[in-house]
Regions:
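Catalytic core of nucleotide-sugar-dependent glycosyltransferases
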Residues: 205-213, 219-251, 260-264, 271-300
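Flexible acidic/His/Gly-enriched loops in nucleotide-sugar-dependent glycosyltransferase catalytic domains
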Residues: 98-174
Length: 353
């Protein structure tokens, strides 16, 4: 097979129910210069590996790599090493590409050769929005805004130059949020090779994202959640300050960081496997005493940035963090009442914007 323009890397693990939809969406793409699909079977215990082989048997554009179960980062790294194209895209086995997605991404790249191309996604499989070539260009100092717009943290809504991406790797030490580190590594590399690059964003949703997957905070408990996310946020903040992101973006970023962390603390109380309640409370209390959290709260105070979780975390009130997180999770109006109560208790000195 001659060298294709674009390669799609799909890590596969227990994906028998969705793999056919995923691969069919890739192979249906019309790409000038051709495409290659690499399926990496990460030691899946179900019939996923056989399904991968069946696709390779009937379509020469499909290559299958089988490996022992080592996690999604190792699977992506294996696919990355095998990629033989000018550009590449990552796709998860329970997601799908919308018709025309890959050529739209390539067209955007050709329009702005020095840019980093990203696109929106949809969680509605029946979304009828047309795939168009409409783009928005953003400068490098909108990095924090990309996070706030839910465009930054994932690897599968971006077009990568294969030669550049192959200089990097997904960090296997992380069990959560490792995608963000890879994306930031790529942006850092791009900034060194093309200092004047910009972000080119396709406004149409090109990927269907199945948000019912396991692994999010809402579906899976991570014992090291309150350790991992501060590390990711420290890296993100460093990149944002280096990009000179404006305060009007940094304030909501810090607010979002506090929300992620506080709700991780509440999740310790709700789902930590420790049988004794006192043990769970001790873990939550330790998380609320984190130096990273103290530094974040102090930064927010200096910036004048309010969050509903600001006072509960400042007071290290396990009970109040729990009540607010549960109210937000269940959609209770109590969350809004406590949010505004904290705002007025602070004399409206901190900003809500």
């Amino acid at each position: 097979m001659s060298k294709p323009t674009l390669c799609v890397i799909v890590p596969v693990y227990k994906a028998a129910a969705t793999l056919d939809r995923c691969v069919a969406s890739v192979l249906a793409q019309q790409v000038a210069g051709g495409l290659h699909c690499i399926l990496v079977d990460d030691g899946s215990p179900d019939e996923s590996g056989g399904l991968c082989d069946a696709w390779a048997a009937r379509d020469p554009r499909v290559t299958v790599l089988h490996q022992e179960n080592r996690g999604v980062s190792a699977a992506r790294n294996a696919g990355l090493a095998a990629a033989d194209s000018e550009y590449l895209v990552f796709l998860d086995a329970d997601d799908a590409l919308r018709p025309g997605a890959l050529q739209a991404a390539l067209d955007a790249q050709n329009t702005a050769p020095q840019s980093f191309v990203l696109w929106h996604y949809t969680t509605d499989e029946q979304d009828a929005a047309a795939v168009t070539s409409d783009i928005a260009t953003r400068p490098q100092n909108t990095l924090a805004r990309l996070w706030l717009d839910c465009l930054l943290a994932m690897p599968w809504n971006k077009l990568y130059r294969t030669a550049a991406a192959q200089q990097l790797a997904f960090d296997r030490q992380y069990t959560l949020g490792e995608d963000l580190q890879f994306v930031l590594d790529y942006i850092d590399l791009l900034g060194r090779t093309a200092p004047d690059f910009a972000y080119t964003i396709l406004t149409a949703p090109l990927t269907f994202y199945d948000c019912s997957r396991e692994g999010t905070l809402s579906t899976k408990y991570h014992a090291d959640y309150c350790k991992i996310w501060p590390e990711h946020f420290a890296r993100l903040n460093k990149a944002c300050y280096a990009a000179h992101c404006p305060q009007e973006d940094m304030r909501p970023l810090h607010r979002a960081e506090l929300t992620v962390y506080a709700e991780g603390v509440a999740d310790i109380l709700r789902r930590d496997p420790a049988k004794r309640r006192a043990v769970r409370r001790d873990k939550a209390d330790a998380a609320l005493r984190s130096p990273w959290l103290h530094a974040l709260l102090e930064r927010m105070r200096i910036e004048g940035c309010y969050s509903a979780y600001y006072l509960p975390c400042r007071w290290r009130s396990i009970r109040l963090v729990w009540v607010m997180a549960e109210a937000r999770r269940t959609g209770s109006p109590l969350f809004g009442k406590l949010d505004w109560a904290g705002y007025y208790l602070l004399g409206r000195r901190l900003r809500r914007d």
